[in-house]
């Protein structure tokens, strides 16, 4: 099988060493495809030039190719079986025009809870959309979505053998939507230290919760990538996951990252059918489902209970399950096969 993994214009490198959910997913698919025995071409100028030593890198984007051009003919003659792309592309006319000339499948994963696809973007066979959670399946029901847990990998982020850490960790972008202040309060209730890892996206949000964020039990780490990011997760006793009431998580990378590192998770959710429910089980974490009408303090106390529950789990067992559940080879094989 010949697979093309397409980049897109953005602020992160391909592959990124840290953040960038779609970029990390595309890299995981490329890694999984090659490990599964497929031939892989990295398509687009965004892929790191250093990869040319080990990968076939072609700096071409389908949406930039003219009808009847030599570039179109060369792409068609290459004979791709599958293209893997960011979720917007099957709804972009310039991209789909070129793709239709190639006689191959396309697969993508929905990383946004709000993007509106065209009515003809997916048929469930030649063009396939994959979604992480029951919540996302319901949101995109008109496009014949297929349930699947996304795998996200970064460059040089190989996980060490699992060990039981000591401090709590929260990782992600720091803003209102991700609501780390609830994790900080839950840690405070338990008398535990918590490390906050990630870039600040909203300074006003941080100022609103300054008393919590400046408390003695909070350690600000900043944005990490590569081995340092992996170590921050692996060295924790529990990964604490939060988000705001109205926010819909399309396919959080942190579930796979934490479980693959052997760190159990304590997740706060405001409804059933979320990514946390799809990703976790009793052996890998604890999910606190809180009525969104409840106050933050109630949510923090429920989350604190979940942290204590998750802390009793076996880290080596968590890692074993995580490596299987979020295996890039399994993920690629699921996405490369048409439904029966």
PLM region descriptions:
Residues 15, 243-256, 268-277:
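Nucleotide-sugar-dependent
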Residues 62, 293-340:
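A charged, aromatic-enriched C-terminal amphipathic alpha-helix characteristic of glycosyltransferases
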Residues 130, 146-197:
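Conserved donor-binding/catalytic core segment of Leloir-type glycosyltransferases
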Residues 198, 207-227:
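Nucleotide-activated donor-binding/catalytic signature segment of Leloir-type glycosyltransferases, i.e.
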Residues 234-250, 263:
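Acidic donor-binding loop of glycosyltransferase active sites
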């Amino acid at each position: 099988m010949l697979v093309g993994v397409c980049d897109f214009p953005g602020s992160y490198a391909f592959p990124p060493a840290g953040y960038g959910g779609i970029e990390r997913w595309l890299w995981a698919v490329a890694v999984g495809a090659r490990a599964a025995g497929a031939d892989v071409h990295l398509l687009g100028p965004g892929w790191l030039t250093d990869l040319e030593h080990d990968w076939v890198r072609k700096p071409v984007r389908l949406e930039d190719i003219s009808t009847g051009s030599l570039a179109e003919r060369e792409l068609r003659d290459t004979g791709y079986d599958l293209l893997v792309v960011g979720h917007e592309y099957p709804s972009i006319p310039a991209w789909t025009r070129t793709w239709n000339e190639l006689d191959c499948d396309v697969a993508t994963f929905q990383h946004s809870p709000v993007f509106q696809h065209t009515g003809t973007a997916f048929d469930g066979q030649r063009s396939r959309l994959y979604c992480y959670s029951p919540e996302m399946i319901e949101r995109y029901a008109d496009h014949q979505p297929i349930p699947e847990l996304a795998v996200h990998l970064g460059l040089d982020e190989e996980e060490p053998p699992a060990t039981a850490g000591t401090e709590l960790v929260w990782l992600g972008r720091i803003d209102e939507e991700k609501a780390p202040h609830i994790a900080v309060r839950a840690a405070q209730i338990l008398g535990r230290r918590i490390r906050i890892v990630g870039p600040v996206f909203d300074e006003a949000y941080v100022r609103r919760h300054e008393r919590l964020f400046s408390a003695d039990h909070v350690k600000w780490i900043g944005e990490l990538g590569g081995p340092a990011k992996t170590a921050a997760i692996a060295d924790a006793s529990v990964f604490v996951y939060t988000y705001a009431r109205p926010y819909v998580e399309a396919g959080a990378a942190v579930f796979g990252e934490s479980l693959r590192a052997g760190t159990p998770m304590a997740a706060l959710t405001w409804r059933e059918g979320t990514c946390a429910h799809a990703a976790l089980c009793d052996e890998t974490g604890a999910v606190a489902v809180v009525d969104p009408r409840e106050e933050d303090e109630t949510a923090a106390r429920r989350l604190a209970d979940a942290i204590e529950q998750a802390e009793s789990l076996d880290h080596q067992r968590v890692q074993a399950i995580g490596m299987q559940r979020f295996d890039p080879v399994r993920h690629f094989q699921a996405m490369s096969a048409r439904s029966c």
